[in-house]
């Protein structure tokens, strides 16, 4: 058996307000589908965020319909779940429209029972768990859910996903053990040990950098986004050390072909994102670093200069000498540490891990792109605070020394 595992396609994303980028996201998806046909896969899994929005434009929907004709015309079924970008809070999503058009099959918890060549349903409480079917293999999954939901429903989640036969699990979630290594600023709703056991392959989405690990003997795989979604997902990062640049290579972009449950990454060439990090004490040093970076910047790349300085100065001249397709300049005063009574204090120590993540995301150049993540972090954090307050109230009441003397206990005796 051979299938393709894609995620985070983000159709319709006019990155940096550039319609050209939405076209590039669509063209990369087209390349991936054509590669799937060439590889003669049996089916395709899209592990969330086919669209960048739950309300894509008519033009974006039209593009999706056109592109999904590629697997349909080659008799390749596509199984999909909703991600945090394209899910709806209630009712059908645009994915269900594509399902009605016969272009893909939506798996997960649904209000209605669905039975056809590639879908079957199992009653779960007030819902139907709709599962994909291909030969003797089942494809289980559900749409993106928040940290607060998993905190309240983890046992339910583990209870409904119990494979009796060969099966794949498809999720669009952050796994903490993985996000801490790949994308520390990402919110994570689950630990690796929270995943239900017994699946032959865990097809994940949500994290935009590719990553492979195992859960027991089964592969746990993030293919990453097809295109570079922000500058955190760079092709190359240049870090100035005061003399020269140290180069950090980012992750490749593409998807996985999985044959007999063994994943193989398929690379797709996409536009380069270059992240240039310069920290300097003087205007002279920063100018020297900017000029030294020029030979490392391809003409058609998107570039971000991340400049940290002691004292601001005009940086408009950078736009005149950097020959790139797109240029963004982010500046910040060096203020990692504050002085308190003559002692150096790490500013992070004043915040919890969740609070610092929110501050980090909110101060990013791509703030608007991270709104969903910030909301998820805050909703989970509020839930935790509420629970801790309740537990605190409960702890204030101790059992009476003599359980039979309730009046003495109430008097404090």
From Swiss-Prot:
Positions contributing to Mn(2+) 1 binding: 8, 10, 49, 208
Residues that bind Mn(2+) 2: 49, 84, 172, 206
MF terms (GO), sorted A to Z: 3'-5' exonuclease activity; DNA end binding; endonuclease activity; manganese ion binding; Y-form DNA binding
Domain of life, per lineage: Archaea
UniProt keyword Electron transport, yes or no: no
Cofactors (names): Mn(2+)
Coiled coil: none
Family of the protein in this entry: Belongs to the MRE11/RAD32 family.
Self-association and partners: Homodimer. Forms a heterotetramer composed of two Mre11 subunits and two Rad50 subunits.
Protein name: DNA double-strand break repair protein Mre11
Organism of derivation: Pyrococcus horikoshii (strain ATCC 700860 / DSM 12428 / JCM 9974 / NBRC 100139 / OT-3)
Lineage: Archaea, Methanobacteriati, Methanobacteriota, Thermococci, Thermococcales
Name of the encoding gene: mre11
